[in-house]
Amino acid sequence: MARTEGDTWDLGSSVGATATSVAANRAFASRSTAGGPEPLLNDPYADLLVEAVGLPHFIRVARGEIDFDDDPLFGARQMLEQITVRTRHFDDFFAGAMAAGPPKIRQAVILASGLDTRAYRLPWPAGTVVYEIDQPTVIEFKTAVLADAGVAPTAERRTVGIDLREDWPAALRGAGFDPTRPTAWIAEGLLIYLPPDAQDRLLDHITALSAPGSRLATEHMDAKALTGEWARAMTERARRHGSDVNLSELFYSGPRTSATEHLRAQGWQTEVLSSNDAYQAQGFAPVADHLVAMIGDSGYLTARLD
């Protein structure tokens, strides 16, 4: 179903299903060594959450029961490498942000947190508060599943159940967020699901809430990746393997100001890590040529507000 203004979802539909898909991929990478001595990732809770959502396709992905090896677009190796690079990149961002300073950063915000498990699995410094923002039903589901399994956060976790199209800055402050203290923000896999004007507003809100020393990590999207071709190709791939998630209906394609340019105009110091450099930083070969042709210079954006 195509996106509409004010639409809602759960973890089995629309944008919510993409959160389940990402968690399934993390679970798959957490049980795959790809020929090495250790699993590619260590997310002990992704599988638990995917099983609780209960969608058969994503359960099979998480268990490694689907053969992606011969897919012409994105085989199992590329799939495992992509989720490994992405997850490690944002994990490393938080680790680096917490180690930086002065001033020390001791509050983190995960926007559109979905089935993100970082508040439960990263070794946060003492005194860190992690805020998770997402739709109320998504927040409630994850909280309940992990609590029922006896899993406790590794930092003080505060949840903010609100749609990012609503007044989430007020809700965040109401949960105890202190805009006078530096913050580490991540918007992982989020911007492509926002209309161009909503992306700009989100970045403006982040800027308004960020004290000097704050840091932000998100994706950098090349214009080539916003034409809709990438979404169509990934939708066709999903259907080949039994999923009915239609990314063509979920992405907002077309012209937009890049997050990098927008943040620079707001006074942030920005750095873009290309996909190839991100892969090589994690010990993988460069991205396949046919994928580069579709995603262009897309990669990872980090920013610092001095």
Swiss-Prot record:
Protein name: Putative S-adenosyl-L-methionine-dependent methyltransferase Mvan_1345
SUPFAM superfamilies per the UniProt record, alphabetical: S-adenosyl-L-methionine-dependent methyltransferases
PANTHER family listed in its UniProt record: S-ADENOSYL-L-METHIONINE-DEPENDENT METHYLTRANSFERASE YKTD-RELATED, S-ADENOSYL-L-METHIONINE-DEPENDENT METHYLTRANSFERASES SUPERFAMILY PROTEIN
Sorted UniProt keywords: Methyltransferase, S-adenosyl-L-methionine, Transferase
UniProt-listed Enzyme Commission number(s): 2.1.1.-
Family: Belongs to the UPF0677 family.
Top-rank taxon, per record: Bacteria
GO molecular function: methyltransferase activity
BP terms from Gene Ontology: methylation
Signal peptide location: none
Organism of origin: Mycolicibacterium vanbaalenii (strain DSM 7251 / JCM 13017 / BCRC 16820 / KCTC 9966 / NRRL B-24157 / PYR-1)
Family annotation (InterPro entries): Ppm1/Ppm2/Tcmp (IPR007213), SAM-dependent_MTases_sf (IPR029063), SAM_mthyl_Trfase_ML2640-like (IPR011610)
Residue positions binding S-adenosyl-L-methionine: D134, D163, L164
Lineage: Bacteria, Bacillati, Actinomycetota, Actinomycetes, Mycobacteriales
A Pfam short name: LCM
Keyword Flavoprotein on entry: no
Known role: Exhibits S-adenosyl-L-methionine-dependent methyltransferase activity.
